[in-house]
């Protein structure tokens, strides 16, 4: 049986927002944690320059790849404790890794998979629970539209929040 949740965890012990669950449901998808794939020096690859000004050794906290036939949608998620800034390099680096993996798949296996869309999401907060409305109502969050690495969809969430994937895909 396929899992229906993706656990997104922040590895920094000082972070206020430590984990969020994405409720994905069934379907043709998988998730990966690019932070855990880097070496002991936190590099994506020893072949890449590690000088100041290079963002390619950064990684977001989670990627979810959703397959629709031969078209792929990738949701890139990063958790931030407070002010949601400084995430573009993390998204760019992880996006480049996905492109590299697809290139290898095409080169060595003739795979017809194509990256149709990337969606960039920053979930931030974690310090305290969101306020409860005084009257019973369904909380309305903004919906995610088209995003870019430097213009991600942002949503404040408490620790251990459950967020539906479809809300983040727009």
PLM feature segments, named:
Residues 65-73, 124-128:
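Short, flexible beta-strand-to-coil junctions
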Residues 109-170:
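Domain-level recognition of nuclease-like catalytic cores that cleave nucleotide substrates
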Residues 62-64, 73-81:
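Conserved catalytic cores of phosphodiester-cleaving nucleases, focusing on short active-site segments
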Residues 81-130:
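Catalytic cores of nucleic-acid endonucleases
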Residues 50, 54, 78-86:
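Short coil/turn segments at secondary-structure boundaries
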Residues 16, 20-68:
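Active-site metal-binding core of divalent-cation-utilizing nuclease and nuclease-like domains
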